Amino acid sequence: MTVLMFFVIYFGSVVLLCSYNFITCGNFWRTGYSALNRKWFFFYSLIIESIVLVVLPQVRYLFNEPYINSMLGTILFVLVLIVCNMGTQYIGIKRLVDIGITNPKWYLGINFLLLGSILLPGEIKSIIVHSVNMVVLVMPSQTIKNNK
């Protein structure tokens, strides 16, 4: 059940991100994001990732709770996680464009690994999360491209 939930959340958030791009600029994928206010990047990212990465492992336990044991509760819970993960993808892509990477589609693969690492044993999950965190920590030392 958790694996199914993982795929629903990941692909749902990719569809939501593409829909947002289509509504705002007419294309499903774009690289012309305006520069993100970098001083708030880690704050936004921390909030959204904490919701996704802290709540998702509890999915199997939450199904025993009365408020999510219904079909409507489950659907609402999954929709909240989809929106949160879409926000993570949007912020991550904007951050990569902000440092000068022109086509950061591969970030969706990193997001897939981060979301999927919840299903892996603890040691493998730690390695994946720490390696991605190291990449994010190294990124601010790169030259910043002004996308105005």
Segment roles from a protein language model:
Residues 2-6, 10-51, 88-106, 132-148:
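Membrane-interface extramembranous regions at the lipid-water interface
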Residues 1-18, 51-85, 113-135:
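Membrane-helix interface segments in multi-pass membrane proteins
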Residues 104-115:
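The cytoplasmic-loop to transmembrane-helix boundary for the fourth helix
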